[in-house]
């Protein structure tokens, strides 16, 4: 795996004076590129290879709790601001703790560069803002997280960016939704809240045919189970608050640049990356940043101007979670599949919505793209009415009722009245959310305790 220059605020920036690639000054990510290391090793070591210059050769990634950085002299400061020297300028743009986190997630996803921001919502917003503007069009999946759905259908729509929401796994629907001004196809690896699998190859083929950027939210999938870039995605986003952090303790988001879209060849369609940027003296990001143009522009322009910066401390906490991602996800999946088996046979359950079940419409895609399993976040329908669903939830002891997922602790929520309550009846029906829908996020507790807790709650209704 080739991982080079993930950290600096402009990745692989070329000097206008000599055209030579400027290497980052304090973290090298090339040592491990001589050998293909396994996921479990990469999640521990990327960004801290031998030869890196982290504080006092610390084994743990240090927390660089600083707002600004000292320039060596006036020329050094001018070169940093003029993008002739790739390094730290100000804490809103870069930080060495954050740099390790960014490089590690990018490595695990197989991307060329990463950018960490304050939340998953910020990551998605910045990703879309980077290439769409008034008059453009977005095609999005009909099974998105409610916040992403509202961003696309309301917030961006109010800014003159139109949208079409479709079943992206249906080729006819997807192709019919494409317009001349379509800039993005946006989908999730496993849809929220039912973990419906995405047909990566189908969507990728349509995106490539029409020269459209394919963006995937891989929060529910995790790079341990699937790497969307390998299936044709151009950009991957994460809410790092979820599986990456894993403990519900810190907010964060990550954007990973696949480096596989030709911005120069599509400059008229994507002028922010392929044409001169007036806010940087006419610099063309596809030229100065090469394959990492996408995240480089977000860092240099959007993050500079709007400032949804992740804190060094949060980056450190999320790094601690990242180091055990593979171990936790294995346990999440193992437990989830056992819970699915328990629920599908329970007399008080009307239906279980999980792609591992042969009856699920996405089972074929699940078998194709998730050979190691997946979907520890899913829903089921309880028999009865909404009050029965609420009573079931209120009688759980181990499961925490809260608006988060992918914690090591098992979680529960009632989507109809909480996370998806702002959707219309039609939109709720499209996502198969009813008053008796219950969403579970299966944690890493002992499986017998999880099932006993569910059984106890069922006994109370």
List each model region and its residues.
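Short, Lys/Arg-enriched N-terminal segments with co-localized hydrophobic residues
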Residues: 18-31
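Conserved PLP-enzyme active-site core in the AAT-like
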Residues: 33-35, 47-54, 115-345
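N-terminal "arm"/small-domain region of PLP-dependent enzymes with the aminotransferase-like
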Residues: 33-95, 103-104, 436-441
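Conserved N-terminal alpha-helix of the aminotransferase class I/II PLP-enzyme fold
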Residues: 73-122, 147-155
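PLP-dependent enzyme catalytic core of the Aspartate aminotransferase-like
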Residues: 112, 153-154, 162, 180-183, ...
